[in-house]
Amino acid sequence: MKKNLTFKELIFVASMLFGMFFGAGNLIFPIFMGQLAGHHVWAASAGFLITGVGLPLLGVAALGVSQKDGLLELSSQIGRKYGVFFTCLLYLTIGPFFAIPRCATVSFTVGIEPFISDGGKMAGLGIFSFVFFAVVLFFSLKPGQILTWIGKILNPLFLILLSTFVIRALFSPAGNMSKIEASGAYVSGAFSTGLLEGYNTMDALAGLAFGIIVVNVIRSLDIKESGAVAKNTIKAGVFSSLLMALIYVLVAVVGAQSRGVFPVAANGGETFAIVSEYYFGKPGQIILALIFAVACLKTAIGLVTSCGETFEKIFPNGPSYRVWAVIFSLLSFL
């Protein structure tokens, strides 16, 4: 039994955690913030990082420092009934009631919908959602492989695709960011508005939810002692947070620079679409579709897995993990 993850293991666990955190909303919010903030992008980004990165890190660290197995055990220190109520409410909110369905709709809206005629969009969304959640369920039924699926395959693929977009944009800026005027609330309150936008990613809640997966994965890597699990959980959280912060800032800068050519878009998804087409032409839509599909897929897998593992613990005499995974996938599809 060892005390510390190897550097390679730590990187893969951090990659897995980052992959679960970083979904479509984490792309849409910063690029749109950058467009609106203009030359105030640095102040806006500072606020965004406090709530969009700092709070999720605190959530992961809280589980690590407390040396608890998950949110249920942590919140049950107030009382068992409260712990069950709070845990169920949080997981259902960031799971099948909101965040998981959004993974399918956002990836469809940004990546697939532009290729479909108006008359076929509803049917297209239904078919896409069915396939999307079938894939999510396939990966979620094997929670012991989540480090491989997300940390070693899906997240590296996502980072390669996103890096292609970001590097191209940064090395050929569409405009001089320092000359772009701020818009809306960013004119006089860039920092505070960025603070709110970072909170809107909902990762503050996800930090508590994903902790159980990180703890289980670290234990599967032959680290069993509670203190060692806690220390390595925090290490993985720090590595993941640093990567999140870097990408948030770079994507926000791309958004700010885009104002040199384009007016403020209706939303972050539209911003990504026009910037992608500007740099890559029509193939840019395919790149964009892949970026959002992979981003949403890995987050949905993480959410279904964490919901299934948690509800199996809450109701030890109830359905098995695999049944819970099916239930949450079906609820999200419907």
Residue ranges and their predicted role:
Residues 6-17, 42, 80-94, 124-131, ...:
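Select transmembrane alpha-helical segments in multipass membrane proteins
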Residues 11-22, 167-175, 184-254, 287-299:
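Hydrophobic, membrane-embedded alpha-helices of multi-pass small-molecule transporters
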Residues 33, 105-124, 219-220, 300-327:
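Helix-loop-helix connectors at the membrane interface of multi-pass transporters/channels
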Residues 70-76, 247-297, 313, 317:
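TM-loop-TM module centered on a large, flexible mid-protein loop between adjacent transmembrane helices
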Residues 141-169:
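Membrane-interface loop-to-helix entry segments
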